[in-house]
């Protein structure tokens, strides 16, 4: 019985230290998620779903967020996704989703672990399946 208790204590200490160290590491090195929103005229029909979609993405732990559209940067890296700033954005103009690959315009694209592209364009093809995730609004 004594041997079991010793092994049990070692096991509990090992697991606890692993969890604590993982937590501390993830706090210092959070995932960077960039959310790119299509604000073309064609998004008018789905614009009501955009804020809820963005809020659903923002429920992840150990993450910092960046929010931008094809026309402007809404906010750079922040621990909270400031989706309320989308209230001032209105869909207008032509669709140009290739801008979401332009790292000279948005340096956050290079820094991001993942880039979520929110659009309703069924014909848009993702170039890098590992980094870019397409969210199609119906």
Predicted regions and their residues:
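An active-site-proximal "capping" alpha-helix that borders the catalytic cofactor pocket
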Residues: 49-67
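Flexible, charged surface loops at secondary-structure boundaries
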Residues: 28-30, 58-62, 106-112
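Short amphipathic alpha-helical segments
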Residues: 48-49, 128-130
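A generic local structural motif
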Residues: 20-22, 52-54, 100-104
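MIDAS-like acidic motif and immediate structural context at the N-terminus
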Residues: 26-49, 120
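Hydrophobic membrane-insertion alpha-helices, especially the h-region
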Residues: 3-23
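Von Willebrand factor
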Residues: 68-118, 122-125, 136-138
């Amino acid at each position: 019985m004594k041997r079991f208790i010793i092994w049990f204590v070692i096991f509990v200490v090992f697991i606890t230290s692993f969890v604590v160290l993982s937590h501390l590491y993830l706090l210092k090195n959070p995932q960077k998620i960039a959310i790119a929103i299509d604000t073309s005229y064609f998004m008018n029909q789905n614009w009501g779903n955009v804020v809820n979609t963005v809020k659903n993405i923002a429920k992840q732990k150990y993450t910092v967020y960046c929010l931008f559209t094809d026309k402007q940067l809404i906010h750079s890296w922040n621990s909270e996704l400031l989706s309320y700033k989308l209230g001032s954005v209105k869909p207008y103009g032509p669709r140009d989703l290739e801008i979401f690959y332009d790292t000279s315009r948005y340096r956050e694209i290079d820094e991001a672990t993942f880039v979520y592209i929110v659009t309703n364009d069924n014909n848009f093809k993702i170039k890098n399946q590992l980094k870019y995730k397409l969210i199609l609004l119906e």
